[in-house]
Swiss-Prot record:
The gene is rpsH. Keywords: Ribonucleoprotein, Ribosomal protein, RNA-binding, rRNA-binding. One of its GO terms (cellular component) is ribosome. Coiled coil: none annotated. Belongs to the universal ribosomal protein uS8 family. This is Small ribosomal subunit protein uS8. One of its GO terms (molecular function) is rRNA binding. It comes from Pelagibacter ubique (strain HTCC1062). GO terms for biological process: translation. The keyword Ion transport does not apply. InterPro entries: Ribosomal_uS8 (IPR000630), Ribosomal_uS8_CS (IPR047863), Ribosomal_uS8_sf (IPR035987). It comes from the Bacteria.
Length: 131
């Protein structure tokens, strides 16, 4: 099956799993999705992730994080979409919820948070925002 927006699919699967209070969610793996999962883990939005291989297909297994029974991720939205790409310079990167959330940005120096992109003074495509 071909997906037109694999990152949007990842976001939807994580949001749906959290609504149902699942502890884990499995999704097709790619290098880009692993980088996003690594950022989510380092920022404390998910517990952990691991790559498993089933029938020669890599699967990304994400352990979701909850606090007092509520999901840690309250908002997880795709910003740049396949039909409408959103780019931003380092100076005009948005602050998510007054700096409490993060934007995940794809830059020439790799995938990073908006905070890291501002420090390195590099802009790029705003993939999604998490709060």
């Amino acid at each position: 099956m071909s997906l037109s927006d694999p990152i949007g699919d990842m976001i939807a699967r994580i949001k749906n799993a959290q609504v149902r209070n699942h502890k884990k969610v499995a999704l097709p793996s790619s290098n880009f999705k692993v980088k996003i999962a690594d950022i989510l883990k380092s920022e404390g939005f998910i517990k952990d992730y691991k790559i498993e291989t089933e029938n020669n297909k890599p699967t990304l297994s994400v352990d979701l994080k909850y606090y007092s029974g509520n999901p840690v991720i309250s908002t997880f939205e795709r910003v740049s979409k396949p039909g409408r790409r959103i780019f931003s310079s380092a100076d005009s990167l948005p602050k998510i919820n007054g700096g409490l959330g993060i934007a995940i940005v794809s830059t020439p120096k790799g995938v990073m948070t908006d905070i890291e992109a501002r420090k390195q003074k590099v802009g790029g495509e705003i993939i999604c925002k998490v709060f």
